[in-house]
Design a protein with these regions (language model features):
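Acidic, surface-exposed loops and disordered segments
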Residues: 1-183
Protein backbone atom coordinates (compact mmCIF):
# COMPACT_ATOMS: atom_id res chain seq x y z
CA UNK A 1 0.00 0.00 0.00
CA UNK A 2 2.88 2.35 0.79
CA UNK A 3 3.90 2.32 -2.89
CA UNK A 4 0.61 4.10 -3.76
CA UNK A 5 1.59 7.22 -1.78
CA UNK A 6 3.36 10.27 -3.18
CA UNK A 7 7.13 9.86 -2.68
CA UNK A 8 7.44 13.00 -0.55
CA UNK A 9 5.33 11.38 2.18
CA UNK A 10 7.42 8.22 2.24
CA UNK A 11 10.82 9.90 1.88
CA UNK A 12 10.34 12.74 4.40
CA UNK A 13 12.30 12.11 7.55
CA UNK A 14 13.32 14.29 10.49
CA UNK A 15 16.94 14.91 9.57
CA UNK A 16 19.67 15.21 12.17
CA UNK A 17 22.35 16.45 9.80
CA UNK A 18 22.52 19.34 7.36
CA UNK A 19 25.23 20.61 5.03
CA UNK A 20 26.51 24.20 4.88
CA UNK A 21 24.84 24.71 1.50
CA UNK A 22 22.39 27.60 1.69
CA UNK A 23 18.73 27.38 0.82
CA UNK A 24 18.26 29.94 -1.95
CA UNK A 25 15.79 32.82 -1.86
CA UNK A 26 14.02 31.24 -4.87
CA UNK A 27 13.59 28.01 -2.90
CA UNK A 28 12.28 29.96 0.10
CA UNK A 29 9.74 31.70 -2.15
CA UNK A 30 8.51 28.28 -3.37
CA UNK A 31 8.25 27.12 0.25
CA UNK A 32 6.27 30.23 1.16
CA UNK A 33 3.90 29.52 -1.72
CA UNK A 34 3.40 25.96 -0.44
CA UNK A 35 2.40 27.34 2.97
CA UNK A 36 -0.04 29.81 1.42
CA UNK A 37 -1.95 26.94 -0.22
CA UNK A 38 -2.43 24.93 2.98
CA UNK A 39 -6.02 24.17 4.02
CA UNK A 40 -7.35 26.76 6.42
CA UNK A 41 -10.60 27.01 8.39
CA UNK A 42 -12.70 29.80 6.84
CA UNK A 43 -9.57 30.67 4.84
CA UNK A 44 -8.20 32.56 7.87
CA UNK A 45 -4.61 31.58 7.04
CA UNK A 46 -3.68 32.43 10.65
CA UNK A 47 -0.04 31.38 10.48
CA UNK A 48 2.78 33.83 10.88
CA UNK A 49 6.08 32.27 9.82
CA UNK A 50 9.47 33.79 10.55
CA UNK A 51 12.38 32.44 8.50
CA UNK A 52 15.73 32.79 10.27
CA UNK A 53 18.86 32.06 8.22
CA UNK A 54 22.26 31.17 9.62
CA UNK A 55 23.51 34.62 8.54
CA UNK A 56 20.83 36.39 10.59
CA UNK A 57 21.70 38.18 13.81
CA UNK A 58 18.72 36.33 15.38
CA UNK A 59 20.05 32.84 14.53
CA UNK A 60 22.24 32.35 17.60
CA UNK A 61 19.66 33.63 20.09
CA UNK A 62 16.99 31.43 18.48
CA UNK A 63 19.33 28.43 18.67
CA UNK A 64 19.98 29.20 22.37
CA UNK A 65 16.20 29.16 22.94
CA UNK A 66 15.94 25.51 21.86
CA UNK A 67 15.85 22.62 24.32
CA UNK A 68 19.18 20.90 25.00
CA UNK A 69 18.14 17.81 23.07
CA UNK A 70 17.38 19.93 20.01
CA UNK A 71 20.58 21.95 20.38
CA UNK A 72 22.50 18.68 20.15
CA UNK A 73 21.82 18.48 16.40
CA UNK A 74 20.08 21.71 15.25
CA UNK A 75 23.19 23.89 15.05
CA UNK A 76 23.90 22.55 11.57
CA UNK A 77 20.69 23.72 9.92
CA UNK A 78 20.94 26.73 7.63
CA UNK A 79 17.37 27.94 8.09
CA UNK A 80 14.69 27.87 10.79
CA UNK A 81 11.00 28.40 10.12
CA UNK A 82 9.19 29.55 13.27
CA UNK A 83 5.41 29.05 13.06
CA UNK A 84 3.27 31.32 15.25
CA UNK A 85 -0.41 32.17 15.75
CA UNK A 86 -2.21 34.95 17.57
CA UNK A 87 -4.08 33.92 20.72
CA UNK A 88 -7.89 34.11 20.58
CA UNK A 89 -11.01 31.96 20.98
CA UNK A 90 -10.29 30.10 17.71
CA UNK A 91 -6.88 28.90 18.88
CA UNK A 92 -7.65 25.19 18.33
CA UNK A 93 -8.59 25.80 14.69
CA UNK A 94 -5.52 27.97 14.22
CA UNK A 95 -3.23 25.25 15.60
CA UNK A 96 -4.80 22.79 13.15
CA UNK A 97 -4.26 25.21 10.26
CA UNK A 98 -0.62 25.71 11.27
CA UNK A 99 -0.20 21.93 11.24
CA UNK A 100 -1.47 21.82 7.66
CA UNK A 101 0.86 24.68 6.69
CA UNK A 102 3.82 22.94 8.30
CA UNK A 103 3.04 19.68 6.52
CA UNK A 104 2.82 21.51 3.18
CA UNK A 105 6.20 23.11 3.88
CA UNK A 106 7.82 19.80 4.82
CA UNK A 107 6.47 17.96 1.77
CA UNK A 108 7.48 20.77 -0.60
CA UNK A 109 10.90 20.85 1.06
CA UNK A 110 11.26 17.14 0.39
CA UNK A 111 10.42 17.77 -3.27
CA UNK A 112 13.17 20.45 -3.37
CA UNK A 113 15.70 18.12 -1.68
CA UNK A 114 15.68 20.21 1.49
CA UNK A 115 15.76 18.22 4.72
CA UNK A 116 13.58 19.24 7.65
CA UNK A 117 13.12 18.44 11.31
CA UNK A 118 10.11 19.77 13.26
CA UNK A 119 10.76 20.63 16.89
CA UNK A 120 8.51 21.00 19.89
CA UNK A 121 11.14 21.84 22.52
CA UNK A 122 12.09 25.48 23.20
CA UNK A 123 11.82 28.24 25.78
CA UNK A 124 8.81 30.27 24.62
CA UNK A 125 9.88 33.51 26.30
CA UNK A 126 13.40 33.31 24.86
CA UNK A 127 12.09 32.64 21.33
CA UNK A 128 9.66 35.56 21.58
CA UNK A 129 12.38 37.87 22.86
CA UNK A 130 14.96 36.85 20.25
CA UNK A 131 12.51 37.27 17.32
CA UNK A 132 10.49 40.19 18.77
CA UNK A 133 7.25 38.16 18.71
CA UNK A 134 4.40 40.00 20.48
CA UNK A 135 3.20 38.34 23.72
CA UNK A 136 -0.32 37.71 22.40
CA UNK A 137 1.15 35.15 19.98
CA UNK A 138 2.11 31.51 20.48
CA UNK A 139 5.06 29.71 18.93
CA UNK A 140 3.44 26.52 17.61
CA UNK A 141 6.52 24.77 16.28
CA UNK A 142 9.98 25.41 14.92
CA UNK A 143 11.26 23.68 11.80
CA UNK A 144 14.99 23.18 11.25
CA UNK A 145 15.84 23.11 7.55
CA UNK A 146 18.86 22.58 5.34
CA UNK A 147 20.38 20.65 2.47
CA UNK A 148 21.34 17.05 3.15
CA UNK A 149 24.43 16.70 5.31
CA UNK A 150 26.80 13.85 6.06
CA UNK A 151 25.80 11.52 8.91
CA UNK A 152 29.51 10.82 9.45
CA UNK A 153 29.72 14.08 11.43
CA UNK A 154 27.18 12.88 14.01
CA UNK A 155 28.11 11.54 17.43
CA UNK A 156 27.34 7.87 18.15
CA UNK A 157 23.89 8.47 19.70
CA UNK A 158 22.74 10.79 16.92
CA UNK A 159 24.16 8.47 14.24
CA UNK A 160 22.11 5.64 15.74
CA UNK A 161 18.95 7.80 15.65
CA UNK A 162 19.75 8.93 12.11
CA UNK A 163 20.20 5.37 10.83
CA UNK A 164 17.12 4.00 12.57
CA UNK A 165 14.49 2.69 10.16
CA UNK A 166 11.31 4.76 9.96
CA UNK A 167 8.42 2.63 11.17
CA UNK A 168 4.73 3.18 11.72
CA UNK A 169 2.22 1.61 14.09
CA UNK A 170 0.01 -1.22 12.85
CA UNK A 171 -3.31 0.14 11.57
CA UNK A 172 -5.35 -1.30 14.45
CA UNK A 173 -3.45 0.89 16.93
CA UNK A 174 -4.62 4.12 15.31
CA UNK A 175 -7.63 3.43 13.09
CA UNK A 176 -11.08 1.91 13.48
CA UNK A 177 -14.39 2.04 11.66
CA UNK A 178 -17.80 3.00 13.05
CA UNK A 179 -16.90 2.96 16.78
CA UNK A 180 -13.95 3.28 19.16
CA UNK A 181 -12.10 -0.05 19.12
CA UNK A 182 -8.83 0.89 20.78
CA UNK A 183 -7.40 -0.52 24.02
Amino acid sequence: MKDKLIPEIINRKSSLTFSDEKITIDEIQILIESIKWAPSSRNMQPWKVIFVSKESTSYKSLFNSLSESNQEWASNCTLYAVFCVEDDKRLNKKFLDVGYAGQNLMLQSERLKIDTHPMGGWDEDKVKKSLKIPNENHVVFILAMGKKGSPDKLNVNLKERHDKERTRNPNEENFSFDIWKFN
